[in-house]
């Protein structure tokens, strides 16, 4: 599927009629493979699933910088026009930078049934250009960059040395108060990429909708992946890692089934 601002792959049962739909958005690895893996799994449960790529494929931005929020708007419009989709039952799953992307977009266009955010951020961070910071925002709206938290080596080293979070730039905070869709938040208290745990706390405290739940894990870090898949990133007892990944996956399934 080739949209104006996104590319995607759709997974669904051809016999489906007015089925609920999900948009799957992965993180800073780009391309589509990880989103596609999850879309395939969720489609087996009766959802029409659109795995979305927003950079890293031919025809899309090369790097994670200045990605238009209109990417997700276009993905939602595509699903609403699909004859087999129930346009009133569309949810979004985002993980890592994808969760940040989804939260930023939904703070302006809150028009889906529910959100699952895995290892989220509640601020817009600077973009990534290869292995370096891009000196631009990760996201744009109407071709204008969203205010963003700049990457400063001093802040990063301080957070690692003293195990304290560096202060967030207030102008870069995502306006969570504009979101009223039900939300499930998943994250780790030992996230090695960013402080997803405090982001979850801040999202919960600023949320003004009617239903938000969260689950925090203490063994698995940022890569809280699909259950039953090996996770060699962490040198910990595989049974503890699998228990957490299984719990987060079941929470995701049950949340989407409920909403």
Annotated model-derived regions:
Residues 16-19, 24-61, 192-196:
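Short substrate-entry loop that stabilizes the transition state in hydrolases
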Residues 30-36, 74-143, 162-169, 178, ...:
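Primarily recognizes the serine-hydrolase "nucleophile elbow" in alpha/beta-hydrolase
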Residues 54-87:
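Catalytic nucleophile-loop/oxyanion-hole region of alpha/beta-hydrolase
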Residues 38, 181, 195-206, 229:
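Short alpha-helix in the alpha/beta-hydrolase fold that links the catalytic acid
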């Amino acid at each position: 599927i080739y949209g104006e601002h996104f590319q995607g792959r759709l997974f669904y049962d051809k016999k489906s009629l007015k089925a609920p739909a999900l948009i799957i958005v992965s993180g800073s690895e780009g391309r589509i493979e990880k989103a596609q893996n999850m879309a395939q799994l969720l489609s087996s449960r009766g959802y029409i699933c659109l795995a979305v790529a927003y950079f890293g494929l031919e025809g899309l931005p090369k790097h994670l910088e200045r990605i238009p929020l209109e990417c997700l708007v276009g993905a939602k419009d595509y699903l609403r026009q699909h004859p087999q989709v129930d346009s009133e039952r569309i949810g979004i799953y985002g993980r890592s930078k994808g969760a940040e992307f989804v939260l930023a977009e939904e703070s302006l266009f809150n028009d889906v049934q529910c959100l699952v955010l895995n290892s989220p951020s509640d601020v817009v961070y600077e973009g990534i250009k290869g292995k370096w910071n891009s000196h631009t925002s990760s996201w744009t709206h109407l071709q204008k960059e969203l205010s963003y938290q700049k990457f400063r080596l001093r802040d990063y080293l301080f957070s690692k040395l003293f195990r304290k979070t560096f202060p967030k730039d207030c102008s870069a905070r995502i306006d969570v108060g504009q979101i009223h869709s039900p939300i499930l938040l998943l994250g780790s208290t030992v996230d090695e990429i960013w402080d997803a745990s405090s982001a979850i706390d801040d999202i919960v405290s600023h949320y003004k909708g009617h239903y938000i739940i969260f689950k925090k894990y203490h063994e698995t870090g940022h890569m809280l992946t699909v259950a039953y898949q090996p996770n060699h990133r962490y040198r910990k007892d595989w049974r503890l890692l699998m228990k957490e990944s299984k719990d987060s996956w079941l929470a995701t399934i049950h949340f989407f089934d409920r909403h």
